[in-house]
Amino acid sequence: MSPTLPDVAVTEPSTLSAPLRWVGMQDIAIPVQLETGSSQLAARASVQVDLPRAELKGIHMSRLYRLLDTHLQQPLSPAMLSQLLQALIDSHADCASRAARLTLSFELMLRTPALRSEGLSGWRAYPVHIAAQCRAGRTTIQLQIEVLYASTCPCSAALSRQLLSDAFVQQHAGRDTLPLRDVVQWLQDHGTYATPHSQRSVAQVRVELPADAQRLAIQQLVGLCEQALATPVQAAVRRPDEQAFARLNGANLMCVEDAARRLRKPLAEHYAAFHVAVRHLESLHAHDAVAETGSDDAVLGPTTM
């Protein structure tokens, strides 16, 4: 038996000579770690390099996998991702590769406290997508998160208030004054005469990290977005928390345009390039309402909803 195994990627030329923009692997199951000593997260990775040499049959995919596996044993950081991309390029010097790209997708689990109940908290999952690319010695890293929130329609709220006030006037026609306790009792009995429609909504936010970024700062981006929206969905709730959530929704009525603009302002203060896509899963309509915005000079494409 021959001790040498055949390697057609090296020994056989391509019968259809052409350079390839990207070649590699997709949907690789691999664990990642966000901080030193933290738990590992199940992730999916894609990794590719370019193949400028038209006559070569293919790249060395095992090299990509081994480098990915080795580097991802370290906590995720902009520096580590940049080192990994350069190592991928260097590993394919015989292919004249000049560019590499990597994507990572996973869910970040965060424990969030209840709005009112002391000591009560629950877990929420945030989909995270990282896209890193190195070309001509320049590395760019994009970070995308998904945040769930509630949206109560301001138009529907106005219509509901009108119906409620009309019902009050009709029932108390001819009376100029009413005891306060009677008004309170009427509101208790009829306050839900009409209610505005609200729904679970989703915001996908993508940012490009500054070139000098030391950390991915995923949790900080989540907090920035949830603070701007003001009505993030809750995990563990009791009645006081549900009441507080109802109050937040009443104080933060928003249509899809409002939500997109709420996110745009703080993102513009922290990132030079960003893109926002929001979607309200309408309870009134059989379709969704959507809006997008982004930085004027953003090189980021539309987010996939």
Curated annotation (Swiss-Prot):
Q: Keywords in UniProt for this one?
A: Hydrolase
User: What Gene3D superfamilies is this protein classified in?
Assistant: Urate Oxidase (3.10.270.10)
Q: Which reaction does it catalyse?
A: GTP + H2O = 7,8-dihydroneopterin 3'-triphosphate + formate + H(+)
Xref: InterPro entries: GTP_cyclohydrolase_FolE2 (IPR022838), GTP_cyclohydrolase_FolE2/MptA (IPR003801)
Molecular functions per Gene Ontology: GTP cyclohydrolase I activity
Q: Where is this site: May be catalytically important?
A: C153
Q: Which Pfam families match?
A: GCHY-1
Tell me which EC number(s) this protein carries.
Answer: 3.5.4.16
Q: Which GO terms describe its biological process?
A: tetrahydrofolate biosynthetic process
Annotated pathway, please?
Cofactor biosynthesis; 7,8-dihydroneopterin triphosphate biosynthesis; 7,8-dihydroneopterin triphosphate from GTP: step 1/1
Locate the coiled-coil region(s) and give their ranges. Answer: none
UniProt lists the family membership as follows:
Belongs to the GTP cyclohydrolase IV family.
State the function annotated in the UniProt record.
Converts GTP to 7,8-dihydroneopterin triphosphate.
User: Which HAMAP family has this protein been placed in?
Assistant: GTP_cyclohydrol_B (MF_01527_B)
This protein's name: GTP cyclohydrolase FolE2
Which species is listed as the source?
A: Xanthomonas axonopodis pv. citri (strain 306)
Lineage per the UniProt record: Bacteria, Pseudomonadati, Pseudomonadota, Gammaproteobacteria, Lysobacterales
Q: Which gene encodes it?
A: folE2
